[in-house]
Amino acid sequence: MRVRWLRKALRDLDDEAAYIAADDWLAASLVVQRVIAAVGMLAEQPGLGRPGRVPGTRELIVRKTRYIVPYRVRVDSVEVLRVFHTSRRLPGRW
């Protein structure tokens, strides 16, 4: 199954990386690698995440980080909707 990142999700990941890199570029790189690796597993295991708070979505908790990746499973692809730090208040919709 193909994994497709929405623009908002890519922007979220880029913003988070920039924020972390201001203090520690190595930590930022590690977080990005972990998020990308975790999301990559969805191609083979789209049901990996828990049921999402927003109907019709699932949420992948990225191990060894404090990030949640909401996504939607389509017939032939997985859509990555956003990337959120767990300290943030999550929106009611994506």
Where are these regions (language model features)?
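Enriched for short, Lys/Arg-rich terminal
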Residues: Y67-I68, R72-W94
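Conserved strand-loop elements at the edges of beta-sheets that form or border functional pockets
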Residues: V62-K64
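Short clusters of hydrophobic/aromatic residues that line enzyme substrate/ligand-binding pockets
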Residues: L48, L60, L90
